Amino acid sequence: MNTATLSLAEQIHRRLAEKLHTTLLEVIDESHLHAGHAGASPTGLGSHLRVKIASPLFTTVSRVQRHRLVYDSVQDFIDQGLHALAIEVI
């Protein structure tokens, strides 16, 4: 499937699954909850995401390093306008 047809949440899901070998992964678009706030997308989609994630790569690293791994995996999306990414490591 062409990534141009995927939502931002779907693209990030695909990226995190590929890069971090996830065993559990949910990417939830919460942009609609932030309508009218600074950084909110005018379309109401893709500016605020929540990630619930588990990966075997997280077992030997600190909480800060886990978050760094996630942020490093999606940095290009942040550079393109993703405003907020909440991370919940399971």
Place the predicted regions along the sequence by residue:
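Contiguous, often N-terminal, cationic amphipathic patches that form binding interfaces
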Residues: N2-V64, Y71-D72, D79-I90
